[in-house]
Amino acid sequence: MRILIVEDEYVSRRFLYKFMKEYGECDVTVNGKEAIEAFIISLEDENPYDLILLDIMMPEIDGMKVLKTIRLMERDRGIIGHERVKIIMTTALNESENVMEAFDEGCEAYAAKPLDTKKLISVMEKLNLI
């Protein structure tokens, strides 16, 4: 499984990397701009990500805008349904409006920080990633 971790906060980024590397090849970006660039490169190389763990509050471009941009790029390239990358939003913002907006924009799951690894495993199983 190819995984992109998008997290600006060092401790969270390191935690996610150490945990997720057991499930696949992980790339890490520290802001939304880098995330979009990494996603484009993965498509151009015909080696797309299977999963993106995407923080909402980040510098450059926030996670909601990254989510919207990725879904638009997929749509424009004819990537639909189960072929789309699975996106799990990871954030300390657990307000219902943020959760609803993320689902409206096309994320598959929403994980509040601090992350519970057992719940994350369960979500990945439900998404047929593991």
Regions found by a protein language model. Name each.
Residues 7:
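Conserved acidic carboxylate
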Residues 115-124:
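C-terminal output helix
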Residues 82-83, 94-109, 122:
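Alpha4 helix (beta4-alpha4-beta5 surface) of REC/receiver domains from two-component response regulators
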Residues 10, 28-41, 63:
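Helix N-cap/capping motif at the beta->alpha junctions
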Residues 58:
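Receiver (REC) domain active-site loop signature in two-component systems and cognate sites
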Residues 37, 64-82:
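Short amphipathic alpha-helix used as the core "switch/output" element in two-component signaling
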Residues 10-28:
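Two-component/phosphorelay signaling modules centered on CheY-like receiver
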